[in-house]
Swiss-Prot record:
Transmembrane feature ranges: none
Assigned keywords, A-Z: Heme, Hydrogen peroxide, Iron, Metal-binding, Oxidoreductase, Peroxidase
Pfam families, per the entry: peroxidase (PF00141)
Name of this protein: Catalase-peroxidase 1
Keyword field contains Transcription regulation: no
Cross-link Tryptophyl-tyrosyl-methioninium (Trp-Tyr) (with M-250) residue location(s): W96-Y224
SUPFAM superfamilies: Heme-dependent peroxidases
């Protein structure tokens, strides 16, 4: 851009929309934040509309890609030289920190989207120097282009780092699609500063399992725990509690946790040979000439042995570029004492260590340094339960390698979803329970057979309410965050779902009994999962017909029925619907307003704001509220798929009044009570954005559009977990 000579006025108004403007949220902080639902909008995605990542990934010569990554590991670059000439440790840390932000509570975080490229993760204190790891990989990403997502590359790079250092990994699956902007739905904590004291997210400082839900890290900006100890105070037994709780929140048991801790620290090193004040701003705060990188180090050479990342300095093992059992050898054969790193961080170092057991310097093999352990590493020795596991691993290296390889695969694939989404030749054949396996079906249904089944379902003793609500309950716990839940598998009939309060166990038991009886009379095998969805679909179709619209609600057979043996009860507990605005359900009163809870569920279901609106209006008209509650059922034609909810919501002849724990809809002139409503019902008339959608569906010329849009959104919910379609 060429400057003209002489001064001139700024070409934009100061305080423009591209700088520090006051947002609507600033002026009205309690307004409903619908932005999280816009993440499902594809406008920010620069790829062609018909781009299919799965098809592109299949074009990759996977063996060539893996060899490229192996060659890359030892191709040290002068601008960011590899420790001991091998990038393995750096790539493993990058992959780990990509996948390790996953939490079981809501399925968010994790390595499934390449989110490490964007704020806040790209600038977290725990991710110092990972900007360099990503830039080092750019030539490989550039070569493979659209066929290889950043998200898949991060994980595969970690895999190949281990392979290149001697570990046989359990496998690899592609299929992670990149996002193109920061995620707005993920709650990382309420703190306003990095590494704020843990008291900010624990209800009790002593009870280390009181970490705020859904968080799975002890401090803002960390992946798991503070490596120096709780709040930077070394105490391995106390740190063990943090390790156990944070890994539990990622669905890891003690054995997996110990294996991951040891295996992750068998290779690579920590970097703290300098002063923290020598580091420049993080990527998001760095100047434009840094080109998206940050933490420029002004100390010494700023790279190599002078690298600064965590502040802890040293390698864990004697041979940090080789997979072996050296971690346990050093941990158990030496006593360890607390020391300070050159950067002033707490670390554990061995007492009277043999010279040959020390790792060599990253630049000069004639120099040796003490190995180190973090407080979390010492927890593996000092916590009695972890110690038993660690001793077993020490005595049986092959067992350790197998447990670690499986745990690493779980860590890096947990949020990829079921195996139907896995891509590539290295997908393990073995089904693992955390993948929520579902048996494949061996039947198909013709259109006539589907029509006959619909008729049989409608002729059972089940009401439309029972059919629709059960189908909805079966499908609604799908999460687009980690692709778990949904109607496929019919797990609504198994523990724990069959007993969830929100699934109305008594009603559910009746519905399942009737459907199982019908299933036993059919001429051909049809899964219960298909019958549950088809029952709701048939009832919706009938409700549309009763409203005067002959529409066919799409139905795709092919769902299987999972078994108890294929279901990890404990890991399904977080999927329990404690709230569901679509059925006007709250298990109890929560500090968070019901409408905000609904937005969270809507996002996890992969729905947009218009889809949410049409579904709520339709479910109210169908009378599908929890327990057949009348809140929000603004119609005299309950069970008919009409737009009455929107017509009456926007009718200025009505007035809304607070009454105890609900609202009353009264005639503006006579004060006659017409209906009752919840906060969720009223928000579709009070929020300006949602009201615009409500007005659209209330229009006289949009009654048919309402029916068609409801059917489309209903079908999307029913098929959300059908990755085979």
């Amino acid at each position: 851009m060429t400057k003209s000579s002489g001064g001139g006025k700024c070409p934009i108004m100061h305080g423009s929309m591209t700088s520090e403007k006051k947002t609507n949220t600033h002026w009205w902080p309690n307004s409903l934040k619908l932005e999280i639902l816009r993440q499902h909008d594809t406008k920010a995605n620069p790829l062609d509309e018909d781009f299919n990542y799965a098809e592109e990934f299949k074009k990759i010569n996977l063996e060539e890609l893996k060899q490229d990554l192996k060659n890359f590991m030892t191709d040290s670059q002068e601008w960011w030289p590899a420790d001991w000439g091998h990038y393995g440790g750096l790539m493993i840390r990058m992959a780990w920190h990509s996948a390790g932000s996953y939490r079981l509570a809501d399925g968010r975080g994790g390595g499934g989207t390449g989110n490490q490229r964007f704020a806040p993760l790209n600038s977290w204190p725990d991710n110092v120097s990972l900007d360099k790891a990503r830039r080092l990989l750019w030539p490989i990403k550039k070569k493979y282009g659209n066929k290889l997502s950043w998200a898949d590359l991060f994980i595969l790079a970690g895999n190949m780092a281990y392979e290149s250092m001697g570990l046989k990994t359990f496998g690899f699956a592609g299929g992670r699609e990149d996002i193109w902007h920061p995620e707005e739905d993920t709650y990382w904590g309420s703190e306003k500063e990095w590494l704020a004291e843990t008291k900010n997210r624990y209800s009790s400082d002593e009870e280390r399992d009181s970490l705020e839900n859904p968080l799975a890290a002890v401090q803002m900006g960390l992946i798991y725990v503070n490596p120096e100890g709780v709040d930077g105070n070394p105490d391995p037994l106390r740190t063990a509690k943090d390790v156990r709780e944070t890994f539990k929140r990622m669905a890891m048991n003690d054995e997996e946790t110990c294996a991951l801790t040891a295996g992750g620290h068998t290779v690579g090193k920590c970097h703290g040979n300098g002063k923290e004040e020598n580091l420049g701003p993080e990527p998001e705060a760095a100047d434009v000439e840094e080109q998206g990188m940050g933490w420029r180090n002004s100390g010494g050479k700023g790279v190599g042995r002078d690298t600064m990342s965590s502040g802890i300095e040293g390698a864990w093992t004697t041979n940090p570029t080789q997979w072996d059992n050296g971690y346990f050898y050093l941990l158990f054969n030496y006593e360890w004492e607390l020391k300070k790193s050159p950067a002033g961080a707490w670390q554990w170092e061995p007492i009277d260590i043999k010279e040959e057991d020390k790792p060599v310097d990253v630049e000069d093999p004639s120099i040796r340094h003490n190995p180190i352990m973090t407080d979390a590493d010492m927890a593996m020795k000092m916590d009695p339960d972890y110690r038993k596991i660690a001793e077993k691993f020490y005595k049986d290296p092959e067992y350790f390698a197998d447990v670690f390889a499986r745990a690493w695969f779980k860590l890096t694939h947990r949020d990829l979803g079921p195996k139907d989404r896995y891509l590539g030749a290295d997908v393990p054949e073995e089904d693992l329970i955390w993948q929520d396996p579902i048996p494949k079906v061996d039947y198909s249904l013709s259109e006539q057979e589907i029509a006959d089944l619909k008729e049989k379902l409608l002729n059972t003793e089940l009401t439309s309410y029972e059919l629709i609500s059960t189908a909805w309950d079966s499908a609604r716990n799908f999460r687009c965050s980690d692709f778990r839940g949904g109607a496929n598998g019919a797990r609504i009939r198994l523990a724990p779902q069959k007993d969830w309060h929100g699934n109305e166990p008594e009603k559910l038991h009746k519905v399942l009994r009737v459907l199982e009886d019908l299933q036993s009379t059919l001429d051909k095998k049809v899964s219960l999962a298909d019958l549950i969805v088809l029952g709701g679909t048939a009832a919706v179709e009938k409700a549309a017909k009763d409203a005067g619209y002959n529409v066919t609600v799409p139905f795709a057979p092919g769902r299987g029925d999972a078994t108890d043996e294929q279901t990890d009860v404990e890991s399904f507990e977080p999927l329990e619907p404690l709230h569901d605005g679509y059925r006007n359900y709250l298990k109890k009163d929560y500090a968070v307003p019901a409408e905000e809870l609904m937005l969270d569920r809507t996002h996890l279901m992969g729905l947009t704001a218009p889809e949410m609106t049409v579904l709520v209006g339709g479910m109210r008209a169908l009378g599908a509220n929890y327990g057949e509650s009348e809140h929000g059922v603004f119609t005299d034609r309950v069970g008919t798929l009409t737009n009455d909810f929107f017509v009456n919501l926007t009718d200025m002849n009505n007035v809304w009044k607070k009454a105890d724990d609900h609202y009353e809809v009264r005639d503006r002139k006579t004060d006659e009570l017409k209906w009752t409503a919840s906060r969720i019902d009223l928000v579709f008339g009070s929020n300006s954005i949602l009201r615009s959608y409500s007005e659209l569906y209330a229009q006289d010329d949009n009654q048919e559009k309402f029916v068609k849009d409801f059917v489309k959104a209903w079908t999307k919910v029913m098929n959300a977990d059908r990755f085979d379609l």
